[in-house]
Amino acid sequence: MATTIQNNFRIRRNFGKINKIAEIPNLIAIQKFSYDKFLQADVPPEKRDDTGLQGVFKSVFPIKDFNETSSLEFVSYHLEKPKYDVDECHQRGMTYSAPIKVVVRLVVWDKDEETGAQSIRDVKEQEVYFGEIPLMTENGTFIINGTERVVVSQLHRSPGAFFDHDKGKSHSSGKLLYNARIIPYRGSWIDFEFDHKDILYVRIDRRRKLPATVLLRALGATPDTAKKDPVEFHGSAEEILKYYYDTETIRVEGKGKFEKDLVPDLLKGQRATRDIRDPKSSEVIVKKNRKYTESAIKKLVAAKMKSLPVEPEEVYTKISAEDVVDETTGEVLLEVNEEVTEAKVEELRKRNINEFKVLFIDNLNILPALRDTLMQDKISTPEEAIMEIYRRLRPGDPPTPETATNLFVNLFFNAERYDLSKVGRLKLNYKFGIEEPLENTVLTKRDILEVVRFLIDLKNGKPNKDVDDIDHLGNRRVRAVGELLENQYRIGLVRMERAIKERMSLQEIETLMPHDLINAKPVTAVIKEFFGSSQLSQFMDQTNPLSEVTHKRRLSALGPGGLTRERAGFEVRDVHSTHYGRICPIETPEGPNIGLIASLSTYARVNEYGFVETPYRKVEKGRVTDEVTFYSALEEEKHIIAQANAPVDKKGNFTEAKVWCRKEGEYIYVRPDEVDLMDVSPNQLVSVAASLVPFLENDDANRALMGSNMQRQAVPLLRTQAPLVGTGIEAIVARDSGVTTVAKRDGVVQSVDASRIVVKADVPTSATDVANEVDIYNLIKYQRSNQNTCINQKPIVKPGERVRKGDVIADGPATEMGELALGQNVVVAFMPWQGYNFEDSILLSERLIKEDVFTSVHIEEFECVARDTKLGKEEITRDIPNVGEEALKDLDESGIIRIGAEVKPGDILVGKITPKGETQLSPEEKLLRAIFGEKAGDVRDSSLRVPPGVSGTVINAKVFSRKGVEKDERAKAIEEMEEAKLLKDQNDEIRIIQDSAFQKIRRLLLGKEVTARLVDDKGEQLLKKGDVLDDALLDTVPQRYWGEIAVAGDVQDLARKIIDNFEEQKELVKLLFGEKIGRLKKGDELPPGVIKMVKVYVAIKRKLAVGDKMAGRHGNKGVVSRVLPEEDLPYLEDGTPVDIVLNPLGVPSRMNVGQILETHLGWAARNVGLRLQEMIEKEYGPEQLRKKLRAAFAGTEGGPASDRLAALIDDVPEKELPKLAQKLRRGMHVATPVFDGAREDEMKALMEEGSATLQSILFDGRTGEPFDQDVTVGVMYMLKLHHLVDEKIHARSIGPYSLVTQQPLGGKAQFGGQRLGEMEVWAMEAYGAAYSLQEFLTVKSDDVVGRTRMYEAIVKGENTLESGLPESFNVLIKELQSLALDVELLETPEAQAAREAAERDLGGGPLGAPRGAVASGEKSSA
């Protein structure tokens, strides 16, 4: 079994006990899936769903003109092929995008004046270019202007209805005031709120509030726009009250005698106002002033009582539920919502009306809030209500009934203006238990009525009604790339729609074609702006593969339509119980964004509505099945969920009598038969970065957060090493990140070199088919990443090896053997050493630097642009004025540095000269110019030089020239090289297809008898009739004649068919490569005014140095404080010096014990490797090796992973065993999954296998004496982080100054100075260093006059220093004067004279800025 010692596959001993049920979904699927759904590029136009781009077009089109005599309709769209591929876009600084073409139809109508009927006069259909749309690369990124960017998914509040209260903060009484808000996806918000008097108000779009009943009445006046509306509602007071209150019928039995119908539901909780007796037995069922209990109500029903007596005082406070009208006169005796009084009842009795309906309001469970609101409301008809709403929304506009109704209908019932989205509709249906179709995304009357009902129920304290938790993941949803872009596209199309409407009405529509109407500029501008400057379109973090993956899986609550850092409180940032398995509780930034930026958990995915789902295993009758289903936070609510590590036997039954479970965010202890679901895996709780931390369960959460964040900052090293102690997820991250090369099809490796791999794929084909069975993988060599780290791929397969689809065949940056490798395994000791590891400092061995263990390569890109200026063209050349030959030694004749040159700060990379402005010449100069020609004087050197702090090797140069500009020698050379590379690929591809085709013909011909003589072009015989073909004979015939060999049967026809197929494939390949070469040869698209652009790439080797930041995976970070020679470091008994000495005090208070466990397990794993190495050296037999390997890899306990490994080792052939053991010489790799890791007894067993100890005796390297106590020594995986001292060190001599204050700029990028702040001034004062202080505050900062004097003094050799006035003092005076305070500076005559003299020398006024000053805020190159 060859797989064990293949180079692209590593076996790890896995300590996990839990069998893997579900595979981790592709880590960047969220990006790809969302964008594919948006574009629907591979779906035929007629089959596309109305989502994404198709949905936007469908919602904005048709566009009609103002008179509705013509309309522009959308038919379909399609994407064309992108102009450049991904690599070309990278190199040329282009955007990777595809042109989009839209088919539109312009329909012109004729309108019949009398009947108003419309008939079609004219239809024109046309395909219109609609701008470009960026495409996503297969790694889930976008290339915008040559840089890779990621669009981060946004976590925002889901549309729907939300209920809340003010927590008693609004009113002094501390009363809870409830409110409700209907949030659409786009459109106006509706807010309902109670005030402290229990009156219900409504606000539309946060305007002034109205009584809520105004809105309810207005619903009655909406014309039948919502025909589908399920509720008949006309907005009368009676309807409103009956919708929200139950009614009781009161009958008048005589003066002061009343009774009411017995309604069991309304009696519960009421008090009896007198003894209630059974009519037959006269037994008292409910005593006076006692509550009606459930049993009492049952007795009343059993006694068949139809009505109950009512006391008069109870009746006299009731509220009438409807108008009571005298039918004879038509007079209203008792109005709806009027209080029933004794006088009113008497009036009714007189008129013989003995029955009326009242509202059931008991002031306990049912409060009169809505009735009180109606009383407050002065409006009586729906029409008035609509006018009132219009006045609120458009103050100062005189309303007419028509405009008012239009406005109201457009606000909530018009799909163009209001959109709940499917999600909003889903949420409303779920909340109120209604079954409105999801396609109806506008509000209905019922929605608004139900929101008010729910709010009133909340106020009344009805059971099972509760306020919403807005941090619940059922109320927050994810907007991924596709949806964000869809919204942008809609904005662009709406802008375009206005322009189209205007054009349709302005011009003669009959003569126009669709393309005359459409200008796609607004759409492309919006898209460009979104990708270029939106808060959610971010520069990809490309430090290492993990940072790429994490960036694509990030969820941000910030951005347009989201929160802002300042407004976000603690609740939003906090971990919520619904985050379990959906959002990682650990990985989030420290600082102001904590909790607002999160990461998706490992197994999480986003469903079609944008809610985050996590997988669970079904549990049936206490038995766990292997059926896996995804649940969103809302769907999971009612389930009881067991943990992934709950003990289960082989058949899936829980082994314990009770199981710890989660339900609705609480932790409960239940019987196995009550459990519904079970977690899929222990690491489904955390994100990718957190699940790469071994022994995460033993680390404090704060440190785990730092650990997972710092792994993203690890720099890819020159020599990669996968961790000895991993978690088993490393290979998945490396595969999904896209930095490795993955085989596309099964096949056999044909050839391998450093820059490409050729694989002959297994293509099942028919006898005559010649399919393209070649996969050529061109590897990325020394490319610069966004963070200036180096992207380089190296093959890990050999020719002749079989590869499977999905296998890693080439390692990328920070990967080794297809596994993520962010750092190095080093031997660490926990002990203090001479104070050099005080406060988290790190002491290093010189070996790490000598052997380049932590060396990384960084690539800087420098760009030089030759422009066409007003004074003439700039030129890139070797001929530079006033520069010695020494400085030009590495430039070629085109003025560009040669590849391989070593450069240091100040060296010329690209020679460039710029024309100078003409100056007034003296007569002598004119004469000299006339005699010697005038070349040298009129140009200045503006070459690109290496900036300070950069020294390295030039690894690449690229030249881009404008179309029509003659290419220089260097550009031609680069072009030829690229062309040769492409031709090589083409020829290889053709060669492999040819071999395969003639192999097929050979198989057909072998053993056949020739039926006719075969001659070549010259008439010489190649085969004679009757020859029997074998390999040797066939090889004598040139391949081009094989199709002409005559044999019996249809073999010759088949052979000819194969040759024809081969020729066809060959032409296809040539065409493909021809296109690429054509693109290479044509000129480049450069920005306006640019003639030529040169990019030079310099590779810098950064060794580990004092001041570099290093970290482990457990949040244990530190700075290198000293590099010690190997001989001075503490060493072990066998003489091995340790590599790193860490401070033991970094562990207890930080509570990240995981690092100690990792150290022990790493030590055990390393020692197992050493023991195997000894066994090979002592030539042990294969069976002993096998036994040792089995013990190390499979352990004694077994488990699904160990059993597989044991079987694997048993299958290894004897002669390959030493080879396998040899691969483990640096240590055996183990995996300890998060929350399911190695136990203490397993670690001890492995220690014994490698005869390692938990603590070792260490000897002092300087004296040879053993240290007093045993020391914890082991192997830890250490990372070098991106905070490198070489990139931070900076010094300034003379540089740019700020324009106003004349003080030096700040920061390395501006070549700025060091700030001397208030406290530093105090320190200097405390020392009494007056002259130094004066110098700091004047000439070294902003004393313009003093700076000049200082220069003069130095030139003249004088040692006196006279400081003048700091410029910022003048600024202060001017600012005071601007406040109308007349501040004047009084000068002594000497000072005045000195100042004037200096100003004369400077040639400026008091604010005359010297050369080199720049406006602050502008970046200036030093």
Curated annotation (Swiss-Prot):
Ribosomal protein is among the record's keywords: no
Gene Ontology BP annotations: DNA-templated transcription
Reaction equation(s) it catalyzes: RNA(n) + a ribonucleoside 5'-triphosphate = RNA(n+1) + diphosphate
Cellular component, GO, one term: DNA-directed RNA polymerase complex
Record's keyword terms, sorted: DNA-directed RNA polymerase, Nucleotidyltransferase, Transcription, Transferase
InterPro entries (alphabetical): DNA-dir_RNA_pol_bsu_ext_1_sf (IPR042107), DNA-dir_RNA_pol_bsu_external_1 (IPR019462), DNA-dir_RNA_pol_su2 (IPR015712), DNA-dir_RNAP_su2_dom (IPR007120), DNA-dir_RNAP_su2_hyb_sf (IPR037033), RNA_pol_bsu_bac (IPR010243), RNA_pol_bsu_CS (IPR007121), RNA_pol_bsu_protrusion (IPR007644)
CDD domains to which the protein is assigned, alphabetical: RNA_pol_B_RPB2 (cd00653)
Enzyme Commission number, as recorded: 2.7.7.6
Keyword Nucleotidyltransferase on entry: yes
UniProt cross-references to Pfam families, sorted A to Z: RNA_pol_Rpb2_1 (PF04563), RNA_pol_Rpb2_2 (PF04561), RNA_pol_Rpb2_3 (PF04565), RNA_pol_Rpb2_45 (PF10385), RNA_pol_Rpb2_6 (PF00562), RNA_pol_Rpb2_7 (PF04560)
Region described as Disordered: 1392-1422
GO molecular-function term, one example from the UniProt record: ribonucleoside binding
Superkingdom: Bacteria
Enzyme class, first EC level, given as a word: transferase
Function: DNA-dependent RNA polymerase catalyzes the transcription of DNA into RNA using the four ribonucleoside triphosphates as substrates.
Family the UniProt entry places it in: Belongs to the RNA polymerase beta chain family.
Subunit: The RNAP catalytic core consists of 2 alpha, 1 beta, 1 beta' and 1 omega subunit. When a sigma factor is associated with the core the holoenzyme is formed, which can initiate transcription.
Record protein name field: DNA-directed RNA polymerase subunit beta
Organism: Anaeromyxobacter dehalogenans (strain 2CP-C)
